[in-house]
């Protein structure tokens, strides 16, 4: 698959686009309007700097980013050239029909809201070429819940990336009962072609592999905060210094984005308090306060922490 369209220019959408273009694919990103386009350009500028910095660190053997290059084939100058070409070749489009007109693969990476996704897929289904495979990067929604809105159930599946994909280069490939094995294998191969490690998921599971482990961890951390057990910094330190992990849960939440976290929590707020394993209602209210103040995470300059340019 050569022509790839990414839908959405958020945290992961921008990363998927950059990695895809870096790997030599023709990549188009669809965003809703010029404001979103400018926000995406800012993200792509930052990603370019991140890749360049990572390559220099790799050359000095300080760190390794498997999404950029294997250890045995690493060539600093070649990788830097690929970064510039990848950056230059990304096309940003605000017309959906133009964005998908030649797509072999469409990767949807929009807000974790079922109604928004459903409405988008209903619109998309009327515009797609017959050849196009469609995947969702949804963190939590099962492809079987969305497939009927795509108009191509057998060509639809999930392709879920981890954050900082140039470094954390795993991608989860999950089919549903109507996914044709031919397209499942094609998406697995695409993962390899953009230097990811594709992890096959043969049976649907909300949260896939990574988030089935990550989301309860983040819920536990938010629960400690909202119930007044401890503060953000102390909870992060407990995890980092206690396990040797590079990031604490609230640093992870700021990278993921508090809007995404809020939308996931909202799926659980109707669980009766006496049955809920966490204080979902309290967590939802707390996150809403941050979001209403514009503190949506690292991309906005502030979430649980403040970030300098």
Give the positions of each predicted feature.
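NAD(P)-dependent Rossmann-like dehydrogenase/reductase catalytic/cofactor-binding core
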Residues: 1-2, 23-25, 32, 61, ...
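NAD(P)+-binding Rossmann beta1-loop-alpha1 motif at the extreme N-terminus of oxidoreductases
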Residues: 1-71, 127
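Structural motif
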Residues: 7, 15, 86, 93, ...
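Short glycine/serine/threonine-rich phosphate/pyrophosphate-binding segments
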Residues: 13-16, 115-119, 141-143
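Structural signal for hydrophobic packing residues in well-ordered secondary-structure cores
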Residues: 20, 44-55, 107, 128, ...
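Rossmann-like NAD(P)-binding element
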Residues: 35, 50-133
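Rossmann-fold dinucleotide-binding core
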Residues: 133-202
């Amino acid at each position: 698959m050569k022509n790839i369209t990414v839908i959405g220019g958020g945290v992961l959408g921008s990363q998927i686009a950059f990695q895809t273009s870096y790997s030599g694919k023709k990549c188009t990103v669809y965003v809703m309007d010029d404001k979103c386009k400018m926000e995406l350009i800012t993200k792509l500028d930052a990603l370019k700097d991140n890749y360049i910095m990572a390559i220099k660190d790799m050359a000095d053997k300080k760190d390794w980013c498997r999404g950029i290059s294997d250890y045995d084939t690493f060539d600093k100058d070649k990788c830097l050239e690929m970064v510039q070409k990848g950056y230059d070749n990304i096309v940003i489009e605000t017309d959906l029909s133009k964005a998908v007109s030649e797509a072999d693969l469409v990767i949807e990476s929009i807000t974790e809201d079922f109604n928004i996704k459903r409405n988008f897929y209903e619109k998309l289904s009327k515009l797609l070429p017959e050849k196009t495979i469609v995947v969702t990067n949804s963190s939590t929604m099962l492809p079987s819940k969305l497939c009927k809105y795509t108009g191509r159930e057998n060509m639809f599946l999930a392709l879920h990336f981890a954050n900082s994909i140039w470094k954390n280069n795993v991608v989860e490939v999950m089919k549903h009962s109507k996914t044709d094995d031919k397209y499942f294998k094609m998406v697995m191969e695409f993962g390899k072609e953009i230097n990811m490690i594709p992890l096959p998921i043969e049976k649907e599971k909300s949260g896939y592999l990574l988030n089935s482990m990550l989301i309860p961890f983040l819920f536990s951390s938010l629960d400690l905060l909202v119930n007044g057990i401890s503060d953000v910094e102390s909870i992060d330190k407990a995890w980092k210094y206690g396990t040797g992990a590079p990031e604490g849960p609230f640093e992870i939440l700021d990278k993921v984005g508090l809007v995404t976290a809020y939308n996931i929590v909202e799926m659980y707020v109707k669980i009766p308090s006496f049955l809920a394993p966490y204080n979902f209602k309290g967590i939802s209210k707390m996150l809403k306060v941050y979001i209403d103040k514009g503190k949506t995470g690292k991309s906005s300059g502030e979430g649980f922490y403040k970030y300098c340019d």
